[in-house]
Amino acid sequence: MNLTDLRPADGSKQSGNFRRGRGHGSGNGKTAGKGHKGQKARSGAPRVGFEGGQMPLYRRLPKRGFKNRNTKEIISVNVSMLNRFEDGADVTLESLREIGIISNPKDGVKILGNGELTKKLNVKVSAFSESAIEKIKALGGNAEVI
């Protein structure tokens, strides 16, 4: 037998949760490891955002604005993006999603006139800007609001 083989006898070691504050004989009585008095010795934690009594940041800053729950989330797509389609193709919400130009049209799509269009297309979406309609029709295409 070596010194490295020594193990505590069965049942001599306590396992499980250590019970704090159970008398001074336990070695962890009286203040139970909390020190003396003060905020950190008390039960419960201060609420989120509490800054020791000074005016908290969320009350120092002014209230401002609101989020309109009736607003429509319309995705804008420029005519230059429509050049990914074949010449003479029909452009719809589904085809825009398939080709990867939009991911999730919530309240519709509006075609804007930024960039150049080089192909004749039949576009059927929620809305158009005037310049987008001009560019689509200039190449013999069709712009239809659905």
Curated annotation (Swiss-Prot):
Gene3D superfamilies in alphabetical order: 3.100.10.10
Gene Ontology terms: biological process: translation
Keyword Lipoprotein in annotation: no
Entry's Gene Ontology molecular function annotations: rRNA binding; structural constituent of ribosome
Subunit: Part of the 50S ribosomal subunit.
Function: Binds to the 23S rRNA.
Name of the protein in its database record: Large ribosomal subunit protein uL15
